[in-house]
């Protein structure tokens, strides 16, 4: 998983978003690079544990 990856929630497979940041400053102290910031297609922006997301597509290098 990297910035720009298209992801979906493991708990709600129809819920898609784009990874905006990995290891954001707000979660870095407690969770290091195990969390990311996701911009969901419904307009919400949340912090998620990477293991709770499934990568659908990664951006080309």
Where are these regions (language model features)?
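Basic/aromatic-rich interaction segments and small domains that mediate binding to polyanionic partners
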Residues: 2-59
């Amino acid at each position: 998983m990297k910035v720009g990856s298209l992801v979906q929630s493991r708990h709600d497979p129809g819920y898609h978003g784009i990874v905006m940041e990995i290891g954001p400053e707000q979660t870095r102290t407690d969770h290091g690079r195990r969390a990311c910031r996701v911009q969901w297609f419904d307009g919400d922006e949340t912090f998620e544990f990477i293991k709770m997301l499934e990568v659908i597509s990664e951006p080309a290098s």
